[in-house]
Each structure stands twice: as structure tokens, then as C-alpha cells.
Swiss-Prot record:
N-terminal signal peptide: none
Record membrane topology: Peripheral membrane protein
Name of the coding gene: PLEKHF2
Inducing stimuli: Up-regulated by TNF, bacterial lipopolysaccharides (LPS) and phorbol myristate acetate (PMA) (at protein level).
Residue numbers binding Zn(2+) 2: 175, 178, 204, 207
A biological process term (GO) from this entry: endosome organization
Biased composition annotated in UniProt, kind: Polar residues: 221-233
Region of interest (Disordered), ranges: 221-249
Domain of life: Eukaryota
UniProt organism field: Homo sapiens
Residue intervals of every FYVE-type zinc finger in the record: 152-212
PANTHER family in the record: PLECKSTRIN HOMOLOGY DOMAIN-CONTAINING FAMILY F MEMBER 2, PLECKSTRIN HOMOLOGY DOMAIN-CONTAINING FAMILY F MEMBER 2-RELATED
Record key words, sorted: Acetylation, Endoplasmic reticulum, Endosome, Membrane, Metal-binding, Phosphoprotein, Protein transport, Transport, Zinc, Zinc-finger
GO cellular component: early endosome; early endosome membrane; endoplasmic reticulum; transport vesicle
Name the record gives this protein: Pleckstrin homology domain-containing family F member 2
Length: 249
């Protein structure tokens, strides 16, 4: 069915509409064989708080951006190759329901749908697209994924030293290896993580010691079930600001 739709006028028109919504700042999305499978608003768990984002699922990429005017204008376009994507379901917790992880070697994050049915449909479609892509290319699924960042609101003190309290002066930082929220003194070192950046990135002392010793796997904790015992406020509707988790700290 996907192959049949690839060259259809309707598919070309739909993709063109998405391109126009992102404007000149967005990347071209129309290429031979690409099909727009579906689209919708998902709540993305960003660094500061959950935020509504517009997502577009194609047969080879996942695209999302900030909502400026619903169905008319989006910005801050992000493009994720599906062949690098792995997804895992997340248990419901408080106001955060119907969620799953989107994991890639460069960036991983949690998203939440409005209903359980919508979640199931998204996950099924993503899994099918990934399976079809890998089958055609003969590649194997990626087993290396960037850590999902712990939201700022989950940590009032450094998650490594357990002593430093965060204030407007004593800022929060994120370890790029484990995703923990840490203080400056606990994250002064940098390490080259090629899948995330061509330059050395900030990591905590704990991960630095393990990486320096060659113990790559121990740095990254398993966090597929819980994100937010402290995120008790209702989900935020919309925001036109940047993704907070794209910041340098």
C-alpha cells in the first residue's frame, strides 16, 4: 500500500502542505518514494515541562516541530531517520498517560498521546515503518541510544552528589550519557560521544570514570517505566518556544 501511495498526487500534495507549514526554515521533505503515513499532536516531555508538539510520521522519517498556528504554521523542525528509532511503552503515572519512549543514538525522549487508542496506533505504525525499512535495507536495529533526560522538575538537588541544591545561581546541567540532572562541580568534564556530537559533551563525573575505564553500558540507567513522580501539574497545552532539551546544558 505504501509503494502504491508513493507516487500518488494526494501524497505529494499532503507532503507539500507540511513543507509549507514549516516555511523556508524547514528542510525539504518531498523525495521519491516517501509517503506521509499520519500526523497529530503529541505531548513531548521536554526539559522544563511537557509541551505540545506536532508530529508527522513518514515511511522513512519522523518529523516534529513547535506549533505556532495549528495546521498552518510550525517551526523548529526536527527530522529523525526511522531506521535508527526504537520505541518502548511507558507506564501511566499521574497526569502523564498513554506514553512511550522514542529512542535514537543522538536523542531520546518521551511522548504522550491523548488516548490509549491513539498511543497504540502511533506505536503500531512506527514499528511497522521501522520493520519495513530495516527489512529493505538489510540493516539491524540500533542497540545504542542516547539517554532520556530527567526533567528539571524531578531534581531539586544534584542527582550525583545529593548535596548541591539548585537555585537561579546554581544551575541544573544534564549528563549527556546518563541523562541525570547534576550540578556544575559534578559535571565539569567532557567526553566524546560520537553518536551525539562531533565535539566532547558534558557528562557527570560518574559516567566519565566509567567511560574512561571502557565500561560504556553501566553509565546509562534503565528508565523506561517512570519519569515524573514530581510532575503533578496538568500537561501544558501549547508553546511556541524552543525545545528546552536542545540547550547546551
Amino acid at each position: 500500500m505504501v509503494d502504491r501511495l508513493a507516487n500518488s498526487e494526494a501524497n505529494t500534495r499532503r507532503i507539500s502542505i507540511v513543507e509549507n507549514c514549516f516555511g523556508a526554515a524547514g528542510q525539504p521533505l518531498t523525495i521519491p518514494g516517501r509517503v506521509l503515513i499520519g500526523e497529530g499532536v503529541l505531548t513531548k516531555l521536554c526539559r522544563k515541562k511537557p509541551k505540545a508538539r506536532q508530529f508527522f510520521l513518514f515511511n522513512d522519517i519522523l518529523v516534529y516541530g513547535n506549533i505556532v498556528i495549528q495546521k498552518k504554521k510550525y517551526n523548529k523542525q526536527h527530522i529523525i531517520p526511522l531506521e535508527n528509532v526504537t520505541i518502548d511503552s511507558i507506564k501511566d503515572e499521574g497526569d502523564l498517560r498513554n506514553g512511550w519512549l522514542i529512542k535514537t543514538p543522538t536523542k531520546s525522549f518521551a511522548v504522550y498521546a491523548a488516548t490509549a487508542t491513539e498511543k497504540s496506533e502511533w506505536m503500531n505504525h512506527i514499528n511497522k515503518c521501522v520493520t519495513d525499512l530495516l527489512s529493505k535495507s538489510g540493516k539491524t536495529p540500533s542497540n545504542e541510544h542516547a539517554a532520556v533526560w530527567v526533567p528539571d522538575s524531578e531534581a531539586t538537588v544534584c542527582m550525583r552528589c545529593q548535596k548541591a541544591k539548585f537555585t537561579p545561581v546554581n544551575r541544573r546541567h544534564h549528563c549527556r550519557k546518563c541523562g541525570f540532572v547534576v550540578c556544575g562541580p559534578c559535571s565539569e568534564k567532557r567526553f566524546l560521544l560520537p553518536s551525539q556530537s562531533s565535539k566532547p559533551v558534558r557528562i557527570c563525573d560518574f559516567c566519565y570514570d566509567l567511560l574512561s575505564a571502557g565500561d560504556m553500558a553501566t553509565c546509562q540507567p534503565a528508565r523506561s517505566d517512570s519519569y515524573s513522580q514530581s510532575l503533578k501539574s496538568p500537561l501544558n497545552d501549547m508553546s511556541d518556544d524552543d525545545d528546552d532539551d536542545d540547550s547546551s546544558d
